[in-house]
Amino acid sequence: MAVQQNKKSRSRKGMRRSHDRVAIPAVIYCSCGEPTVPHCVCPSCGTYKGRQVVAKSDNE
């Protein structure tokens, strides 16, 4: 296992970690008006690209 030769400064550590942040997920609004993730089936109505993909029951 590799061992560092010199201590990394707080500045160098911060520069290395500057790209480690968590990305905020993109949100779009379905034709039913509910927010959903792009390229995924809408969890509330079950449509994808304007087509009914998942049959939703009314007893929910």
Swiss-Prot record:
Ribosomal protein found in the keyword field: yes
Keywords: Ribonucleoprotein, Ribosomal protein
Cellular component terms (Gene Ontology): large ribosomal subunit
An example Gene Ontology molecular-function term: structural constituent of ribosome
One of the GO BP terms on file: translation
Source organism superkingdom: Bacteria
InterPro entries: Ribosomal_bL32 (IPR002677), Ribosomal_bL32_bact (IPR044957), Ribosomal_zn-bd (IPR011332)
Keyword Ribonucleoprotein: yes
Similarity comment: family membership: Belongs to the bacterial ribosomal protein bL32 family.
Alphabetical list of HAMAP family matching this protein: Ribosomal_bL32
Name of the featured protein: Large ribosomal subunit protein bL32
Lineage: Bacteria, Pseudomonadati, Thermodesulfobacteriota, Desulfovibrionia, Desulfovibrionales
